[in-house]
Amino acid sequence: MITVNFLILLLGLVFLVKGSDYFVKSASTIAKKLGVSEFVIGLTLVAIGTSIPELASSIAASIQQASGIVIGNVVGSNIANVGLIVGVAALLSPMKTEIDMLKRDGYIMLFSAVLFFVFAFNRELSMLEAGLFVLLYIAYVFFLFEEAEKYEGKLHFKEFITYFFKFKYINSAMQKLNGNRNRNSDSDRNSDSGNGNERLEGGFAKDIFTLVLSCAAIVIGAKYFVEESIFFAELLGIPDTVIGTTLVAVGTSLPELVVTVSAARQGYGSIALGNVIGSNITNIFLILGLSGLFYPLSVAEMSLFFTTPVMIAISLILLIFISTGWEIKRWEGVVLMMFYVAFLVVLFYI
């Protein structure tokens, strides 16, 4: 019986990860064929592509009111992204860093971790606080895509906070929607009746089928992966927070691991590191935010006093390593990996 449950757990993870991969590819292809702008593709697909497993599993856990799995997944994924993934990538090849990684994305990543810690102090992430996280994520994406020219390249943390509290992202969203609506109207006037058939050619129908199939795989995979994770947590007497922080977190971080290690090995250190930092921001602002919109998320004592402070600490260490010679060296990768191993050891003994 336990063997069957374990196989279902693994199968759910495979469906989750591979389904996410095919979902992003097919959705991106469809969007381009339909003439959707690169901005919208980036906003909806590229920005959250590697975080879809965390998103699906967290929402599935939230619906089942398994708050420990949700928070453990997000916090554990963020720790694994830095300690395990950046550590392994830096060990394979030193990664060049840039000042924007520190003063913009790095500080926003740290801000998201600290803000979650502040919200968690009453042992609950309310639906209002979750909504604020989602707004922060929307503002962050619009800030990156829309404000580069206005700030002449100076897109740092201070500018982001100003941008958010002045609600400039609302104007950006309205302008973008109006612009897309006008372009679509012009396109409709200039098109003929044969365009619909042309879209179905070149594999469009196949892309739609792949999208639907991959979406189903994500939903099914998330459902069974979370259910079996809860089963093993109860069977072994392990808190669901621990299961979420380890098994679920590492399992759903596989896309980040593959992308980051691949980029590092090919010499694209900035892409590798940008993927990790972006994923960590997405995990808290978008995934934790959306998950908290279903039900308020209760915060376990372990999450409040151990795993979340560890997440903040390892984020700080990463920022320090980013600024030392603007390169993450191999020995720094080893330090991050040792930090992660030490975290796991302490986690299972407290």
From Swiss-Prot:
<comment type="function">
    <text>Catalyzes Na(+)/Ca(2+) exchange. The transport is electrogenic with a likely stoichiometry of 3 or more Na(+) for each Ca(2+). Is K(+)-independent.</text>
</comment>
<keyword id="KW-1133">Transmembrane helix</keyword>
<dbReference type="GO" id="GO:0005262">
    <property type="term" value="F:calcium channel activity"/>
</dbReference>
<feature type="transmembrane region" description="Helical">
    <location>
        <begin position="330"/>
        <end position="350"/>
    </location>
</feature>
<feature type="transmembrane region" description="Helical">
    <location>
        <begin position="69"/>
        <end position="89"/>
    </location>
</feature>
<dbReference type="Pfam" id="PF01699">
    <property type="entry name" value="Na_Ca_ex"/>
</dbReference>
<keyword id="KW-0406">Ion transport</keyword>
<keyword id="KW-0106">Calcium</keyword>
<feature type="transmembrane region" description="Helical">
    <location>
        <begin position="125"/>
        <end position="145"/>
    </location>
</feature>
<keyword id="KW-0050">Antiport</keyword>
<protein>
    <recommendedName>
        <fullName>Sodium/calcium exchanger MaX1</fullName>
    </recommendedName>
</protein>
<dbReference type="InterPro" id="IPR044880">
    <property type="entry name" value="NCX_ion-bd_dom_sf"/>
</dbReference>
<feature type="transmembrane region" description="Helical">
    <location>
        <begin position="242"/>
        <end position="264"/>
    </location>
</feature>
<keyword id="KW-0109">Calcium transport</keyword>
<feature type="transmembrane region" description="Helical">
    <location>
        <begin position="202"/>
        <end position="222"/>
    </location>
</feature>
<keyword id="KW-0739">Sodium transport</keyword>
<dbReference type="GO" id="GO:0005886">
    <property type="term" value="C:plasma membrane"/>
</dbReference>
<feature type="transmembrane region" description="Helical">
    <location>
        <begin position="4"/>
        <end position="24"/>
    </location>
</feature>
<keyword id="KW-0472">Membrane</keyword>
<dbReference type="GO" id="GO:0070588">
    <property type="term" value="P:calcium ion transmembrane transport"/>
</dbReference>
<dbReference type="InterPro" id="IPR004481">
    <property type="entry name" value="K/Na/Ca-exchanger"/>
</dbReference>
<keyword id="KW-0915">Sodium</keyword>
<dbReference type="GO" id="GO:0006874">
    <property type="term" value="P:intracellular calcium ion homeostasis"/>
</dbReference>
<feature type="transmembrane region" description="Helical">
    <location>
        <begin position="302"/>
        <end position="322"/>
    </location>
</feature>
<keyword id="KW-1003">Cell membrane</keyword>
<feature type="transmembrane region" description="Helical">
    <location>
        <begin position="276"/>
        <end position="296"/>
    </location>
</feature>
<feature type="transmembrane region" description="Helical">
    <location>
        <begin position="101"/>
        <end position="121"/>
    </location>
</feature>
<feature type="transmembrane region" description="Helical">
    <location>
        <begin position="39"/>
        <end position="59"/>
    </location>
</feature>
<comment type="similarity">
    <text>Belongs to the Ca(2+):cation antiporter (CaCA) (TC 2.A.19) family.</text>
</comment>
<dbReference type="GO" id="GO:0008273">
    <property type="term" value="F:calcium, potassium:sodium antiporter activity"/>
</dbReference>
<dbReference type="InterPro" id="IPR004837">
    <property type="entry name" value="NaCa_Exmemb"/>
</dbReference>
<keyword id="KW-0812">Transmembrane</keyword>
<keyword id="KW-0813">Transport</keyword>
